[in-house]
């Protein structure tokens, strides 16, 4: 009786281990895909930042360059 219980427990553990290995592999693939997507997004962000810095400055003067109002 005890041998059957031990065999059943062993079979259950082996089954759980197999499912866990499959889940870990699926999660690994998902993490890898997300890392690749994040790398692409970082590159796009870098390019957009460079374009923004290279664009012409605004025609609006900064507050330091503005003349104070007449009542000041």
Curated annotation (Swiss-Prot):
Transmembrane segments: none
InterPro entries membership: SlyX (IPR007236)
A Pfam family that the UniProt record links to this protein: SlyX
Biased composition (Polar residues): 55-65
Start and end residues of each stretch annotated as Disordered: 53-72
Top-level taxonomic group: Bacteria
Family named by the database record: Belongs to the SlyX family.
Xref: HAMAP family: SlyX
Full protein name: Protein SlyX
Organism encoding this protein: Salmonella arizonae (strain ATCC BAA-731 / CDC346-86 / RSK2980)
């Amino acid at each position: 009786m005890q041998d059957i219980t031990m065999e059943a427990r062993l079979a259950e553990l082996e089954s759980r281990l197999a499912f866990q290995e499959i889940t870990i592999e699926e999660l690994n693939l998902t993490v890898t895909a997300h890392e690749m997507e994040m790398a692409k997004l970082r590159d796009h962000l870098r390019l957009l930042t460079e374009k923004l810095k290279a664009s012409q400055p605004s025609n609006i003067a900064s507050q330091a360059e503005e003349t104070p109002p007449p009542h000041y």
